[in-house]
């Protein structure tokens, strides 16, 4: 047999004589040098000045022919590696052990080539020759035994002999499990392009070398994914499949990663999904995979076992952990619909160790944030979202000098890190990763005298020179064991079943488009056999669009569904519809959202349809408004009059009471009705998504409370819950603007920023405030909780996962005490919904209470009870005293306490460090004045504040209610009561511009209304001062409670005193008109204005509607409207009549 001993001390002796070459740093000739004996450790203590001494040793019990072998010791040459940031110098000697040359040429550097030949292994068509395999095997065995702290000479020599004999007998050899584990870890340690190698010794190795079929490969991979994902606490792992034999029986994973998203070339030339996977996605389709044509479809596994043709396996969805992207500051970021998988697992690399090749060895670490935020999301050949994010941020994307790309990519990375951390999924930012690599590099130079590193790959794609790796010189070389790239298997595979062979294609754009077009044609044929369903939406905030897309998802299980915004839909298309589903909000005074106005106009002009269809409508709104869901009902009535058939009753989603529950119930009801009406095949076997069929009961065994050491950061918690940029202001002062004669209270609230200056705002914008519930309500509920934790104990709610096998943290609320949750996060004043009452019924120990609660689940009973009592949650517990509610129920079922919005009553230029608000304090009694006293949540909370108390808040932009860009344009301001609030910011801004900028504004007339000049004429003296300073042109006030005089409202003033002024401003001078107040006033004002304009300009009803439509389109008719609070049985004339809806 071949003798291994000659390789024991001079591992490289089988190679040709080394050529002399000059060291680029030391300019001396390189000469062959002896290597460490495997019996001597590469002890860090033997290194001096960063360069290890070369030691020699004599092995025991070696053949007599080697007794006279003499190995001389020479000091190895080194390469100086400098850190230009710190000035530190390292000496690399490890590169002398490099196993192959790089492909760089004498006159050119190929360091930036993605897959250089030197790092790529191709296929083989015959076994590795013995004379090539044996030296590598001996070298690895020496390396393995040289890693022990204590020499194992006898075991070492025995293993050398066994390996040599096995190679001579079989032509190859098998690694022991310990050798395999050592090899995989060392290959990671030697990977020059990996920045996270400091964890190299913590790699979990799964030995799958006994695998024989693709099905077994799939099972091993599923185990790998499950272990590595670990519910988000990612663990690094590798699974090693059988080694290459003769090159004809390879095991391969055709995927580049275990988990990756598909990419589709659509018929119109656009790309949907990940553009980097276009070729592989098409291959999967050719192999029989059914595409779904979504942006984030997980590709199947394509597995090749024993050289056979590949097989396709769908990864079980429950194995794929995905993170939905959101931003801690920009709530619109969620509208981008981005997500990413948590597990980065490379699947297509080859492990080389000791002359053996393992072409199937998927392995994973965890993500560095920039891999997703920069490369996956922002690369132009990937998802390419950079410009869209820049536009949404309001950046100047038309000029590179604005650095919009840098600002946008930073926020995208912030979103990625925030999303992973919020969902408790392992991720590392690029700064921390860079620091960890520098530590690893220092460790390696102390331990091995070097660290192969590819600077181009290790410097993160953002931040550049502010990361330490940027300033570090690096030496790149290949050591063994090593992970190599491979040629894509579909380019070299020899097909055994020609029927399975995909059509041979080059990745040419034209060919790929044709293939995708053909696949899409097949999909269209399938979809064409289904009934067409169009989902129309109109929205101001994006809520209706989100629900419309959810509805489309549900209907796509049985219908050919598309989603269309109303501003992109033509009324004439109705003639072609089969099923029309409408989801829309109602805006302002019963109007449609802005993107529904054009369709509304054309739809309501139609007189009849030649073709009828089925339809269903769902409206969103707030029951605070008298025209609740008015536009949805208008659509319903118009479609019915045109002859269309209603599929299901019009649904209503109340923002104040279980809106999403109502939508889900309506959606499922409508879907089932549609399946019955259109006789959908297999309609009884369609699996409706779980989010639409959530259980109407609450199971206590599904929830538990655990203690948490995390202290509550209120601002951070509110920011996370509401996706707002929450900051703290302090109360400076508050002053009652009403006189002592008035029974009501309206406050001028002055808030100051913490620090010199807070976030910027414009006149007319809103301040959102996060109030706290009243202490008495909170304490009353706590006293009735059956398992109430100690008052100040921080707890965290956990829920069982769907499989029921483990607990996961509920992400709705942060860890906090129950008292804090009831005070700051949960709504305890809004009446419970019917669904909540149904869930509560199970906790009633008295049968009468239980039956009454069940009866209230009926719409008629519920509505009477709700509108008569308007009960708080505490009042419900008092009405049904046998209720024993657990703390977990409150934390999981009570709705989130929403912020209250107030128009800002100050100009930031005029009072730079302050924000002023005009707040009406609301109190009322239910049951015709005989019920308990109710207090407005936010107004009462503000009234009880003391100077310097904190106020968590945020600024909400109101783009449609700001001063004209041209200050010379005339304005009419109409605002009775607290509707005056934004106009105070207007006149303060005009005063500042006049005094400090010399800008002379156009005439600005104010129309104000209140009850009595000696009771509630808000800002009376300030208005008079603005008139004297000619900031306000004129002020007209209507009083509605002057004894012995008729009531005068703002619309009366417009009609009797300002008709000519209105016409001049709107029609003659192209000016602006602003209305702020409750919806009833705005409706009356609009009616008066239309009559006035119609009379003056001799317009028909249709023409005047079109005239005001044009005013709104030109953004010259502005409304800031809030809903009137209706008296849930309140006594007429009570303080409730102050219209303050969302500002309670």
Curated annotation (Swiss-Prot):
Impact after mutating residue 968 to F: In strain: BALB/CBYJ
Tissue specificity as recorded in UniProt: Macrophages.
One CC-aspect GO term: perinuclear region of cytoplasm
InterPro entries with a match to the protein in the record: CysJ-like_FAD-binding, FAD-bd_FR_type, Flavdoxin-like, Flavodoxin/NO_synth, Flavoprot_Pyr_Nucl_cyt_Rdtase, Flavoprotein-like_sf, FNR_nucleotide-bd, NADPH_Cyt_P450_Rdtase_alpha
A biological process term (GO) from this entry: response to bacterium
Region listing for Calmodulin-binding, in residue ranges: 509-529
Residues in FAD-binding FR-type domain copies: 724-964
Subcellular location: Cytoplasm, Cytosol
Changes after translation: Polyubiquitinated; mediated by SPSB1, SPSB2 and SPSB4, leading to proteasomal degradation.
Effect upon mutating residue 25 to A/Q: Significant loss of interaction with SPSB2
Cofactor entry: heme b; FAD; FMN; (6R)-L-erythro-5,6,7,8-tetrahydrobiopterin
Binding residues for heme b: 194, 485
CDD domains reported for this sequence: NOS_oxygenase_euk (cd00795)
Region (Disordered): 37-59
Domain Flavodoxin-like: 533-671
Binding positions for NADP(+) per the UniProt entry: 744, 923, 978, 1011, 1040-1041, 1047, 1049, 1051, 1084
Function, as annotated: Produces nitric oxide (NO) which is a messenger molecule with diverse functions throughout the body. In macrophages, NO mediates tumoricidal and bactericidal actions. Also has nitrosylase activity and mediates cysteine S-nitrosylation of cytoplasmic target proteins such PTGS2/COX2. As component of the iNOS-S100A8/9 transnitrosylase complex involved in the selective inflammatory stimulus-dependent S-nitrosylation of GAPDH implicated in regulation of the GAIT complex activity and probably multiple targets including ANXA5, EZR, MSN and VIM.
Name the record gives this protein: Nitric oxide synthase, inducible
